[in-house]
Amino acid sequence: MIDKFLHFDFISKGVIFIETVQTIPQEIADLFQTKGSLLKVEKGTHIFQEGERAEHIFLIKSGSVQISKETESGKELTIRICGKNCLIGESLMFCKFTSHSSTAKAIEASEIYLIHNDLLESFIEDQPSLMMDYLKWIQTENVKNQSRLRDLVLHGKKGALFSTLIRLANTYGEFRTDKEVYIPIAFTNTELANLCATSREMVNRMLSDMRKSNIISVNKGHITIHDLTLLKSEIECENCPLAICRID
């Protein structure tokens, strides 16, 4: 299993890029490429929807995919923003449930591999060492989810927004200094609210206050965090490994 979760590349103009790197076992990624089918999906296309029969597992080759759940009243909670090399639809592997428990939608044009559940399960079952690597990866995902849930619940609405911005920075950010980071994915305030499990109006007010205090700036939905250290101190950041403090 690839245990290097984050890689820093120094390029011109003093910008430091953080790459999203592969965290699933290489053998599984190779199987998608050799035995899977490649889908090209446009922005706004649903890859699968909550309640649909789950027959395939997906690996993102390029692009970004939003994983979300919706209540009966229509309120949406965004669970993950997944990018290159992320596995989606995997929660039902080795499981008796046959329907998707969430919805996956492309938030930009994407290329996605898909493979049938049975093929991937048998491939993992036949290789005990790969099964161990897969279990380690699943456990990392569980800890990541627990950490995000803790931040959403324990630190109030401001803490939920701050932790979401920190996770977006760790996952997709382009670091210009050790404190300042640009998030290249554009978000509306509604989309940020869905990530924070709060209302758009509340996010509007908090972002406005942060802009006035020069903690962030926003240009056409792209957020630049000017003081990441301040955000971390406000939520009593526990300095989790970067493999855990992520949004994907």
Give residue ranges: language-model regions.
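Short phosphate-coordinating micro-motif centered on Lys-Gly-acidic
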Residues: 47-52
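Polybasic "coupling" helices that flank or enter modular domains
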Residues: 128-195
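Glycine- and acidic-residue-biased ligand/ion/polar-headgroup-sensing regions
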Residues: 44, 55-68, 84-85
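Cyclic-nucleotide recognition modules
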Residues: 28-29, 80-143
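Phosphate-/nucleic-acid-contacting segments
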Residues: 170-248
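Cyclic nucleotide-binding regulatory module and flanking cytosolic helices
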Residues: 2-46, 87-88, 92-95, 126
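Short alpha-helix-to-loop micro-motif enriched in aromatics/charged/Gly
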Residues: 72-79
